[in-house]
């Protein structure tokens, strides 16, 4: 089922009856599996008795993206290209800005369907295309369980204010997505270059070592099945423990749209009680979409609530026992072995344990000469090294370290009223030395 709330008309144009095909502009939901935008595009193509082509614009202009991110993305494109072919739709990848790639094929299109992203650049691309197209542009939301505006009409203060609003919508939106069949396939069309030619020639502006994860829906499904059978039982108890191997590792796949959050939620729910997993997947993740969608400053310290900005600036010049530069942070050259291990884990694997990411961000605030510079450093490092950097979850995670979605605590130096974390807490809660040793083994 595709609820009306997922669908938005972005212009007032009428379908071109003499067009050769319908276009699905795939950008945020790179999958053929449980993808509302794709299924809506198939419905549209069938209603017009047209084939469907799927277009992806592979641009090197995406802010802060590097070879690590593009390698993961391209693996997903190859996976989805094969999956689409089995369903009778051809994937066209053009090495250019996404709206330009779609416009290149729009003269012979009857209609265009696009999925939905929440970052500023994704909104700008869609607005640009909407102003240029002479056929209908429909946007279908598929990367959240509850559509963002349905969950809440405003930016929420915290998980506590957001949770009851999204929870009361879950029963309505937690329904399976039926896979449609294309009436007319596009496999005989030859509208664009070969996928392997385009991806093989693509070069990112910044080279980075690949992460340990491979992209694509097939790999995401395999990892999630492994999580359900081997890790879910310990997730509820040990999800915050960086020593335990209990996480789903779905965040990179959710970021690139290689897996559906609805699919994950419904499959996990069938295995039994998993409230903490659903809390993270639904409440916490979709709170991050709420934040990025409604905030004008989601990548800046100006996104923080007034009390957090005020208290941090009041303590901006407090004396600091340790102070580091961006380069020292990036190279994991601090006095703290736990922080260094977290940074190295991110650099080596492309993913840092969630609990350590909180500690990591708090310490950047504590050891930088000014909170605004600390914020920028945390965003920069997260965006550069995390496979799921440049993502609502990442922006929200950094913001939380500085007071977003949290309350004021007892005032102290440097942090003011922002929540504090220290190494003694790690030592008290976890066998943190084992975490450090495990990261050292990764280095070797």
Curated annotation (Swiss-Prot):
Pfam families: DNA_photolyase (PF00875). Its EC number is 4.1.99.3. DNA binds at residue 239. GO terms for molecular function: deoxyribodipyrimidine photo-lyase activity; DNA binding. Binds 1 FAD. The FAD is in its reduced state. PANTHER family: DEOXYRIBODIPYRIMIDINE PHOTO-LYASE (PTHR10211:SF0), DEOXYRIBODIPYRIMIDINE PHOTOLYASE (PTHR10211). One of its GO terms (biological process) is photoreactive repair. Residues 20-148 form the Photolyase/cryptochrome alpha/beta domain. Its cofactor is FAD; coenzyme F420-(gamma-Glu)n. InterPro entries: Crypto/Photolyase_FAD-like_sf, Crypto/Photolyase_N_sf, DNA_photolyase_2, DNA_photolyase_2_CS, DNA_photolyase_N, Photolyase_Class-2, Rossmann-like_a/b/a_fold. The gene is phr. Disulfide bonds: none annotated. PROSITE patterns: DNA_PHOTOLYASES_2_1 (PS01083), DNA_PHOTOLYASES_2_2 (PS01084), PHR_CRY_ALPHA_BETA (PS51645). This is Deoxyribodipyrimidine photo-lyase. Involved in repair of UV radiation-induced DNA damage. Catalyzes the light-dependent monomerization (300-600 nm) of cyclobutyl pyrimidine dimers (in cis-syn configuration), which are formed between adjacent bases on the same DNA strand upon exposure to ultraviolet radiation. Keywords: Chromophore, DNA damage, DNA repair, DNA-binding, FAD, Flavoprotein, Lyase. It is an enzyme of class 4 (lyase). It catalyses: cyclobutadipyrimidine (in DNA) = 2 pyrimidine residues (in DNA). Transmembrane segments: none annotated. Belongs to the DNA photolyase class-2 family. Signal peptide: none annotated. It comes from the Archaea.
């Amino acid at each position: 089922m595709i609820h009306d709330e997922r669908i938005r008309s972005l212009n007032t144009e009428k379908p071109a009856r003499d067009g050769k095909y319908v276009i699905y502009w795939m950008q945020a939901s790179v999958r053929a599996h449980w993808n509302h935008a794709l299924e809506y595009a198939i419905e549209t193509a069938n209603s017009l008795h047209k084939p469907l082509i799927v277009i992806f614009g592979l641009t090197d202009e995406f802010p802060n993206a590097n070879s690590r991110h593009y390698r993961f993305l391209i693996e997903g494109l190859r996976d989805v290209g094969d999956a689409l072919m089995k369903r009778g739709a051809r994937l066209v990848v053009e090495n250019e800005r996404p709206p330009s790639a779609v416009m290149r094929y729009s003269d012979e299109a009857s209609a265009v369907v696009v999925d939905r992203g929440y970052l500023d650049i994704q909104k700008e691309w869609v607005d640009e295309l909407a102003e240029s197209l002479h056929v209908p542009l429909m946007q279908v939301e598929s990367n959240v369980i509850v559509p963002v505006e349905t969950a809440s009409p405003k930016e929420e203060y915290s998980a506590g204010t957001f949770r009851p609003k999204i929870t009361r919508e879950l029963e309505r939106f937690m329904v399976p997505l039926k896979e449609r069949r294309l009436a007319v396939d596009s496999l005989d069309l030859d509208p664009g270059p070969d996928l392997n030619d385009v991806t093989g020639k693509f070069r990112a502006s910044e080279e980075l070592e690949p992460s340990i994860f491979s992209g694509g829906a097939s790999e995401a499904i395999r990892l999630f099945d492994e999580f359900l059978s081997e890790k879910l039982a310990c997730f509820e108890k040990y999800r915050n423990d960086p020593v335990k191997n209990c996480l789903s590792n779905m965040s990179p796949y959710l970021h690139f749209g290689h897996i559906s959050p609805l699919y994950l939620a419904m499959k996990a729910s069938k295995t039994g009680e998993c409230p903490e997993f659903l809390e993270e997947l639904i409440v916490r993740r979709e709170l991050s979409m709420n934040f990025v969608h409604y905030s004008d400053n989601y990548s800046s310290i100006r996104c923080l609530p007034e009390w957090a900005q005020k208290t941090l600036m009041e303590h901006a010049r407090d004396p600091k026992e340790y102070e580091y530069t961006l380069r020292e942070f990036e190279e994991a050259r601090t006095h703290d072995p736990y922080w260094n291990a977290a940074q190295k884990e991110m650099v080596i694997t492309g993913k840092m344990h969630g609990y350590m990411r909180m500690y990591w961000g708090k310490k950047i605030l504590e050891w930088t000469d000014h909170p605004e510079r600390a914020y920028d450093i945390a965003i920069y490092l997260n965006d550069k090294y995390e496979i799921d950097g440049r993502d609502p979850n990442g922006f929200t995670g950094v913001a939380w370290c500085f007071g977003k979605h949290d309350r004021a605590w007892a005032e102290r130096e440097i942090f003011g009223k922002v929540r504090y974390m220290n190494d003694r807490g790690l030592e008290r809660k976890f066998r943190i030395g084992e975490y450090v040793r495990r990261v050292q083994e990764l280095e070797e």
